[in-house]
Every structure is written in C-alpha cells, then in structure tokens.
Amino acid sequence: MGEVAGGRRGSVQHYPLQAIGHHTLHRVHSTHDNNDWLEEAFPQRVFINPVDAAPRNIRDGDQVRVYNERGTLILPCRLTERIMPGVIDIPQGAWYNPDRNGTDRGGCVNVLTSHRWTPFAFATAQHTIMVQVEKAKAP
C-alpha cells in the first residue's frame, strides 16, 4: 500500500495529487512555446479542481508551487471542475525556464517526471507523476 506506478513507497502521503500533461492548442509538443501571441491566447497554467484547491487556500489565478522529489515549478492556476479531484493538469511542451534557485517558471512538466522509461513506450511516464501543490510564496 502507498506505492504508485513509477513512484516510491510513501509517495502518496507526501505527494497526494496525480499530475497529467495534455497536448495544448497553441503548441506542437514544444514548438511555438516562444510565440507571445499564442501565449496570450492560451497562457501556461496548472488546472486544479476546486475540491483540491480549497484546503490549500488556493484561488483561481494564484501562483502555485507544484513539486515532488524530482523538481519544482511555479505557475498560475486555473480552478475548474473539468479536472477530477486528486488530479492536476499541466499542458505539456512548455520550455524549461529556471530561476536562480532552479525552480522552473516556464511550466515545464518534465521537471516532475522520472528518468525511468516506461516498459511499453520506452519514454517518460507522463501520467504517473505524483505531486503536491501549494500557494506560492511571494518572491
């Protein structure tokens, strides 16, 4: 008990939310992430169910810190019931943009993934990312 695919024993207690990454409208994988017009139309953000946001005192539009033992990123959030409780969604393809502390500010979901390959695709496990989310502290 307490072990998740691609994770370690105890991951669920420390990282209770599952992160997934969908293909977004404004990028083809990572192509076009530097297009300011598309970023304005489709800003990079994490989607969170209000059920998960409420106990964390997170409101729509807040900057949030998404993290696990592999990495950390900070980006704005969008509260929506379109994401089931217990799951967050970060659109894939954002470019890695670390600050001076190594925290990604670009919203690159890859900073949270394992380097272990999946047995079927021989690629990273994009849908077994266990994370925690909290309201980001002001810089």
Q: Over which residues does each language-model region extend?
A:
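Long, contiguous, secondary-structure-rich segments that constitute the structural scaffold
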Residues: S30-F47, V51-P139
